[in-house]
Amino acid sequence: EERRNKSVNYNEFMKNVEEFVFAESQPEKADIIFVPGNGFPDMAEKAASLYREGYAPYILPSGRYSITLGKFAGVQSKKEIYGGDYETEWEFLKNVLLKNGVPEEAILREDQATFTYENAIFSRQVTDLHKIQVKKAILCCKTYHARRSLMYYQILYPETVIMVCPACPDGITRENWRETETGVEAVTGEI
């Protein structure tokens, strides 16, 4: 009996972790789409698709490179399409957006951030500089990075409704994250 209760508690705990980490919303018309920096094209591809569908007039990719590496880690997937020598995550993400039909004038620039909280901080500086009043925003990030990204952007945009529209570049989803060590490490690393 005690063993069964522990199993139920464990499963309930894992379900709660899942519900917390994997934030997701239906997109609505917004003032901007945010893309926190990374080396995967999928989040920028998702942002470009939402842009082309008319969800927002601007996209703000954000990122210099990871503070832990000290340089741009390089393109992590789809190198045959997006390969190149990029100095920053922003430069890479901008290229992905351009190749996916987003005009240059719709792409704002933030190329100093080295971790997620800085993505939010410096994005706020950019939107303030451009006098963009952000009442609603869409956030395109990794599936399991959704809650942390959302929390940081909410700190900097407390009056803004932020809709999370994640992409899944590495196959880690709400449905399968418990099946691999990589998935478990990625998700539990977010809490």
At which residue positions do the language-model features occur?
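Acidic, Ala/Val/Gly-enriched low-complexity intrinsically disordered segments
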Residues: E1-E2
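A structural signal for short, hydrophobic/glycine-enriched beta-strand patches
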Residues: N5-G183
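A conserved mid-domain beta-alpha-beta active-site/ligand-binding segment of alpha/beta enzyme cores
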Residues: E181-I191
